[in-house]
Amino acid sequence: MAVVTIRQLLDCGVHFGHPKTRWNPKMKRFIFTERSGIYIIDLQQSLALIDKAYDFVKETVAHGGTILFVGTKKQAQESIAEQAQRVGQPYVNQRWLGGLLTNFQTVHKRLNRLKELDLVDFDDTTRGFTKKELLIQRRERDKLEKSLGGIRNLTKTPSAMWVVDTKKEHLAIDEARKLGIPVIGILDTNCDPDEVQYPIPGNDDAIRSVALLTRIIADAAAEGLIQRHQKPDAEGSAPAEPLADWERELLEQGDAAKAELPVEENDVDAEVSAKNEAKSEDEVAAPVHAPESDDATEAKIEAEATESEKAPVSE
């Protein structure tokens, strides 16, 4: 079942490409026709590639992976932040910092610094900091929040990356290729399809087009999260993270209690069955009185009436 229809793609203007003067010949196989000097993208191919990218993102997240949403152009900033936050995935919608992936250890130190500054009360001057020092720390926090706020919970390099406008985000794609990170991206008619493992031919300049395709990728991540949480319950597998000693002790106590439970139930069942057998024996031993018929009852009443008439009346 398709996750989106061609009508939705048409309504959002996904089929509009760049003018003929701005195109990449490698995108020729994704171009349907040309109208008024503008290339029209083949939405049938886009639809098939959307389904392929959707399945990849869903399986990646279901197996514990993360998707980094990247889109720093104005048309994509709002939708990138909104959809990534909706499904709890990291995102970059401001300037891409060089070495964010290839030099992640240094970036991770800056993330720890950001978390430290989040705990500082900048209005409290009784902690040993002057107003000037607190002002400097506040500015540092704001700067880190703007550049790294979207990836504050990222503890390792992402499993895959969603990119809006692969031509503009060439630095991010270069770092992903060096680390072997798969890239899912919107390919306009001026992009190079060889740079992306999961291309989606479409318009990367229209706000509605970017919002629609980003929402589809976010929906795939959301479905993957649902599968990830349902998988341990269905398969009975152990959690991925190691258990603490007190958690393991509680689980062992619970298992021991469950092991004793069937024995108690068997004893109760045996006692109930014994009582039922004793009750049935008493019922068999007791005499059974057949109910009197209607004729016998009438004869008994007539005999009592006759005896009362024959009895002498005392004066």
From Swiss-Prot:
Chain segments carrying region Disordered: 250-315
CDD domains with a match to the protein in the record: RPS2
Residues forming coiled coils: none
Alphabetical list of Gene3D superfamilies matching this protein: Glucose-6-phosphate isomerase like protein, domain 1, Helix hairpin bin
Gene Ontology molecular-function annotations: structural constituent of ribosome
GO cellular component terms listed in the entry, alphabetical order: cytosolic small ribosomal subunit
Database matches in Pfam families: Ribosomal_S2
Keywords: Ribonucleoprotein, Ribosomal protein
Any one of the GO BP annotations: translation
Domain of life: Bacteria
Keyword field contains Transmembrane: no
Compositionally biased region (Basic and acidic residues): 272-282, 297-315
Similarity comment: family membership: Belongs to the universal ribosomal protein uS2 family.
HAMAP family with a match to the protein in the record: Ribosomal_uS2_B
Name of the protein in question: Small ribosomal subunit protein uS2
Annotated source species: Clavibacter michiganensis subsp. michiganensis (strain NCPPB 382)
Lineage: Bacteria, Bacillati, Actinomycetota, Actinomycetes, Micrococcales
